[in-house]
Amino acid sequence: MAKNARRKRHRILALIAAAAMALVVVLVVTIVVVIMRRPDTPATPPPSAEPPGGVVVPPGTRKPRPEFQSADCPDVMMVSIPGTWESSPTDDPFNPTQFPLSLMSNISKPLAEQFGPDRLQVYTTPYTAQFHNPFAADKQMSYNDSRAEGMRTTVKAMTDMNDRCPLTSYVIAGFSQGAVIAGDIASDIGNGRGPVDEDLVLGVTLIADGRRQMGVGQDVGPNPAGQGAEITLHEVPALSALGLTMTGPRPGGFGALDNRTNQICGSGDLICSAPEQAFSVFNLPKTLETLSGSAAGPVHALYNTPQFWVENGQTATQWTLEWARNLVENAPHPKHG
């Protein structure tokens, strides 16, 4: 009799423990869902191309400029920032050869071939360009570190050029991770905190920008509605802890460069047009795979084809090439001394 009573008591305790564990799981899931679905409530007004009230932020104080610059200075510097797994810190920025199939090479290479070095210098950012998946033993650099390296390298190149050639103009373009970097630099320049003055930037084009935001910059062609994955997944602590900080909207948008910054995004590309349901905090391996671009559908890899994005018969790379060519052809001709 006593033995049966003990068994019954043990069963009751086991049921209570199971119920308590289930309650904990439900509470954790509820908290995560609330965090994921709560509306953004930043301490500062949401970033936009203009601050509230339509008052344009004045650009930073411009550096004094001479009447002429050195004879070896190019009139224009084209900054090309490749995407994930399409660059290397050991590649030659003026003659990159390690990734001949890089998407950006379809733009930068024809430009370098068309214009002489006195008119145009094409600089392809050499950086690690990786995306470590913490659920795989891939020995890759983390997205945070790769993105920061690309940013530092590009800013230094532009700063060095501006110090040596203060009258040189700039054309900036990037793809995927490179588009995030290019967009961040454009945002800094347009808001008076960048490596060069905003009036020296002829234009910016971002292909598959992970921080794309509706109403910020100029949408080109058949872009879908939506926002970049870094905005959709903003403020998800689990990703930051994994070296994948999703940085959200750019503070101040593109500022004074808003009407000179183009956004290109293919329909179905979850990197630049990411609905909330495309990612799941409960399935981080799948989310990380999508973020790396390998599971963003075929769209993310096909901007050099007309399959998912075409404007007036041109692919995204053809459109960007023509856009950049026109900017270079019509750029100022600084005096040389």
UniProtKB/Swiss-Prot annotation:
Enzyme class: hydrolase
Means of activity regulation: Inhibited by tetrahydrolipstatin (THL), a specific lipase inhibitor.
Annotated spans, Disordered: 41-70
GO MF entry, a single one: carboxylic ester hydrolase activity
Chief site of localization: membrane
Keywords linked to the UniProt accession: Cell membrane, Disulfide bond, Hydrolase, Membrane, Serine esterase, Transmembrane, Transmembrane helix
Pfam families in the cross-refs: Cutinase
Catalyzed chemical reaction(s): a butanoate ester + H2O = an aliphatic alcohol + butanoate + H(+)
PANTHER family tied to this protein: CUTINASE 4, CUTINASE RV1984C-RELATED-RELATED
Name of the protein described by the UniProt record: Carboxylesterase Culp6 homolog
Annotated source species: Mycolicibacterium smegmatis (strain ATCC 700084 / mc(2)155) (Mycobacterium smegmatis)
